[in-house]
């Protein structure tokens, strides 16, 4: 059975921002007595995201932390490098005035070493009243006199004990507190590392007061649909389609994309995934693709498959950046932006392409009630797939080859909605289409 979510979320298109980078914050936390009112300045970008075609602002970490935002020290206060709680209130109000929803990044799998409960454990030892909030190893020697479970081997990221009811109480309070202040949605960082039963206990308490909140979890590998069913989340991130898009285009092996779209179609019976071609953890699309001509086909997939699309800031302008596995290796993909849109260079064609494809998506709002049919054509360099419901069809053709592709689609008629090619009714009821080399075609 499909997860039932708020109607607004089914038609959301997010513009994702990593605030500490976007707003040019210091690499490490600032004194609490000197908050920098940066968050409220994001209001200058609301018109920009609306003009792009988005209706949601997805914020990366904003809570008090030591460094990059994922080492939280206080879930109830805004990082002084970004401002105060009132600054976030101002931003949320400005977004809501324009019909824009706001999502926060909830880091609840782990905390920073400066998190008060962990500081107590360091100071008082395993006898601390909140020692059970963590996975401690009192027999393991170390600078603290004991060992503790670290997230993915990072000493600065202390894993929480999700079997402890007090941890569930804390997370439910945090989520409810910020929803009370107007937050519409949550991204759950590293959800894949948390047992789904934890969220099954937490989320009903949040939804009791906020039934329309939309909650999606970060999942990379694993059983996406199973996790959604067992956890009560509304959605998870669709990394399978993300990887298949750029990998199949680079390799000119569109069988990989066909396989991923088939798995994606299976997920739609359970939930509507969060789709993307880039985020704060990945090499940017413009750098990931080996042929810049394939940016357009990649975006065509993003905005035509059922899902909740997200555009990572800068991708709409063709920004480049490579993620590196080292300290500071995310800096290139999380850069500062100007204080307002007037500071940007003139829009590149990719910006207009985003707007055009988002326009196609908006004019075909039925897509999120549809499914992806088995591709009509799959070759190494060409794929043709249809998105269909009971009364609509949208056909998409990608051509990564060096020559114009000619093929017949099993649909009676249609007009070109976007792309570089032609469509004409064939003699036997099919549709004859041509698609230029290294391009795409969308027919509705």
Report each predicted region and the residues it spans.
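A structural motif
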Residues: 54, 183-184, 233-234, 307-308
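Hydrophobic faces of well-ordered beta-strands that scaffold small-molecule active sites
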Residues: 13-16, 57-59, 102-104, 186, ...
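Loop/helix patches that line or flank the sugar-binding groove of alpha-linked glycan CAZymes
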Residues: 7-10, 25, 29-34, 258-262, ...
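Substrate-binding/active-site clefts of carbohydrate-active enzymes
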Residues: 3-14, 18-55, 62-181, 199-202, ...
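Solvent-exposed beta-hairpin/edge-strand motifs
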Residues: 410-422
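Active-site-proximal helices and loops of the catalytic beta/alpha 8
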Residues: 92-98, 119-123, 173-176, 189-269, ...
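C-terminal beta-strand-rich structural cap/linker in extracellular carbohydrate-active enzymes
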Residues: 427-444
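Tight coil/turn sites that cap or link beta-strands
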Residues: 154, 419, 436-440
């Amino acid at each position: 059975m499909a997860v039932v979510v708020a109607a607004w979320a089914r038609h959301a298109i997010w513009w994702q921002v990593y605030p500490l980078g976007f707003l040019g914050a210091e690499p490490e936390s600032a004194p609490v007595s000197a908050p920098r009112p940066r968050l409220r300045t994001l209001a200058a970008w609301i018109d920009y995201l609306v003009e792009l075609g988005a209706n949601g602002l997805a914020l990366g970490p904003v809570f008090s932390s030591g460094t990059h935002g994922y080492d939280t020290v206080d879930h109830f206060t805004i990082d002084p490098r970004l401002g105060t709680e009132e600054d976030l209130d101002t931003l949320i109000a400005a977004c809501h005035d324009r019909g824009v929803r706001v999502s926060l990044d909830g880091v609840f799998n782990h905390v920073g070493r400066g998190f008060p409960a962990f500081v107590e454990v360091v100071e008082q030892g395993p006898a601390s009243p909140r020692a059970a909030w963590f996975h401690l190893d009192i027999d393991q020697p170390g600078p603290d006199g004991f060992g503790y479970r670290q997230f993915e081997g990072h000493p600065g990221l202390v894993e929480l004990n999700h079997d402890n009811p007090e941890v569930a109480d804390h997370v439910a309070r945090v989520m409810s507190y910020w929803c009370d202040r107007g937050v519409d949605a949550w991204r759950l960082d590293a959800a894949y590392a948390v047992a789904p039963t934890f969220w099954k206990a937490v989320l009903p308490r949040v939804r009791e007061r906020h039934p329309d909140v939309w909650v999606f979890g970060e999942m990379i590998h694993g059983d996406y649909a199973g996790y959604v069913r067992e956890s009560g989340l509304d959605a998870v991130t669709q990394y399978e389609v993300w990887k298949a898009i750029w990998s199949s285009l680079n390799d000119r092996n569109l069988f990989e994309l066909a396989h991923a779209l088939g798995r994606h179609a299976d997920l739609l019976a359970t939930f509507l995934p969060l789709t993307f071609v880039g985020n704060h953890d990945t090499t940017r699309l413009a750098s990931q693709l080996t042929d810049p001509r394939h940016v357009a086909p990649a975006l065509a997939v993003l905005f035509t498959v059922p899902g909740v699309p997200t555009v990572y800031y800068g991708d709409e302008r063709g920004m480049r950046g490579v993620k590196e596995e080292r300290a500071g290796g995310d800096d290139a993909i999380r850069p500062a932006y100007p204080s307002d849109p007037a500071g940007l260079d003139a829009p590149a064609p990719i910006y207009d392409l985003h707007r055009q494809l988002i326009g196609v998506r908006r004019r075909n709002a039925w897509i999120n009630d549809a499914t992806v049919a088995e591709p009509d054509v799959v070759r190494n360099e060409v794929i043709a797939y249809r998105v269909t419901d009971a009364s609509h069809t949208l056909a998409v053709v990608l051509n990564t080859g060096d020559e114009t592709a000619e093929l017949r689609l099993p649909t009676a008629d249609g007009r070109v909605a976007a792309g570089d090619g032609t469509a004409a009714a064939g003699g036997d009821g099919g549709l004859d289409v041509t698609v230029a080399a290294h391009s795409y075609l969308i027919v509705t």
